[in-house]
From Swiss-Prot:
Residues 372-392 are annotated as: Disordered. It comes from Xenopus tropicalis (Western clawed frog). One of its GO terms (molecular function) is mRNA binding. GO terms for cellular component: cytoplasm; nucleus. Belongs to the RRM RBM42 family. Residues 381-392 have a biased composition (Basic residues). It holds the Pfam family RRM_1. This is RNA-binding protein 42.
């Protein structure tokens, strides 16, 4: 009894889904011929049988078996999709303005069979699985057995209804709208100019290399001709070469003689002085000019240095140098120094004006310097002159 009630339940569900599809598409509802089945009033045992544990699994297995059979039969019959050719698509139907949600009871028109009740609730899982491709040979669905529910029927859940059975076999309809314009062919114009530029470059660079080899070819024959002419001239003017050879050594010998002349005065610059029966070489005399006029400055204080002494005699235009003599070991002044002039007139004026003047903290004492009398060479010359005169 439970198996029969489950099959009847499935048939009723399929019939309900077919009616729902027809109502959505706006087609007239045609009820399939149904054998008169006595509808017992007490439907309680049927409901109790559906609620059993095995009813759901049996219904699910039967739905899967039917879906597999329908797929295996309808699969080969599907026509391959035809590519879209052009404006062969019929114009779409004007959309029917319907509200977003209409109660199920109001969607159905008045049926002549008023005594046949409809189920008030269909599970969501059964709605999705019951809707599927139907084979033409399948029997029409049977209406669902009526049973009473407490309260008004709840509204159906929103879902997109499947397309009608006649349109499932064909390809999906193409979107209706303005066709996109065909792509325009791209005409490459810029690359045509590049070959002309590349061809022009070789013509510019090939011209100079053609001229250079010609010049190089012309130059080599000139060089051997010059060598031949030079060799010929050398053969003719052979005696002139020995004359050029002695000229070079003469130029080299001249600087050698100059060097000898320069070295001689260096030897004469040695200043050997004599005093108290002893002689020594005084290198300090090389700092002074040999033809100047020097003044001996005595009685100088310890605070007097070269700058103070030079400041005292710098007012004379021919003033050359002033120096204070100091001890080499201690660096203390010895109390005297020397001042030199280039002009003898300034020398005489300084002797008159500066003698006895204060330079520092003491009056200065001036007299003629006798450094030449202490020179060895000068002393020997004087001795020779005296011998010639017969004085000593």
């Amino acid at each position: 009894m439970a198996g029969k009630s489950g099959e009847e339940k499935m048939k009723a569900m399929e019939a309900e889904m077919a009616l729902f599809e027809q109502e959505v598409l706006g087609a007239p509802v045609a009820l399939p011929p149904v054998d008169p089945v006595p509808l017992p009033i007490p439907a309680v045992p049927v409901i109790r049988a559906i609620i059993a544990t095995n009813t759901y699994s049996q219904v699910q297995q039967s739905l899967e078996a039917r879906a597999a059979a329908a797929a295996s039969v309808v699969g080969p019959m599907i026509v391959p999709p035809v590519p879209f050719v052009g404006p062969a698509i019929p114009p779409p139907r004007p959309p029917v303005m319907r509200p977003s949600f209409i109660p199920h009871a109001l969607q159905r028109p008045a049926e002549p069979h008023g005594a046949m009740p409809r189920p008030s609730f269909i599970p969501h899982v059964l709605q999705q699985r019951a809707v599927g491709p139907r084979h033409p040979g399948m029997p029409p669905p049977q209406p669902l057995m009526a049973h009473h529910m407490h309260g008004p029927p709840p509204p159906l859940m929103r879902h997109i209804p499947p397309p009608p059975l006649g349109m499932r076999a064909g390809p999906p309809p193409a979107p209706v709208g303005p066709l996109p314009p065909p792509p325009r062919p791209v005409v490459p114009s810029a690359p045509k100019m590049n070959p002309t530029v590349i061809q022009a470059a070789p013509t510019v660079y090939t011209a100079p290399p053609v001229r250079k080899p010609e010049e190089e070819i012309v130059e080599p024959p000139i060089l051997p001709d010059e060598k031949e002419t030079l060799s010929f001239e050398e053969a003719v003017i052979g005696p002139s070469m020995p004359e050029m050879e002695p000229v070079q050594p003469e130029v080299v010998l001249e600087p050698v003689q100059e060097d000898k002349k320069k070295t001689k005065p260096e030897k004469l610059k040695r200043c050997i002085r004599t005093a108290a029966g002893t002689s020594w070489e005084d290198q300090s005399l090389l700092e002074w000019e040999s033809d100047d006029f020097r003044i001996f400055c005595g009685d100088l204080g310890n605070e007097v240095n070269d700058d103070i002494l030079a400041r005292a005699f710098s007012r004379y235009p021919s003033f050359l140098r002033a120096k204070v003599i100091r001890d080499k070991r201690t660096g203390k002044t010895k109390g005297y120094g020397f001042v030199s002039f280039k002009d003898p007139n300034d020398y005489v004026r300084a002797m008159r004006e500066m003698n006895g003047k204060y330079v520092g903290s003491r009056p200065i004492k001036l007299r003629k310097s006798q450094w030449k009398d202490r020179n060895m060479d000068v002393v020997r010359k004087k001795q020779r002159e005296k011998k010639k005169l017969g004085l000593r």
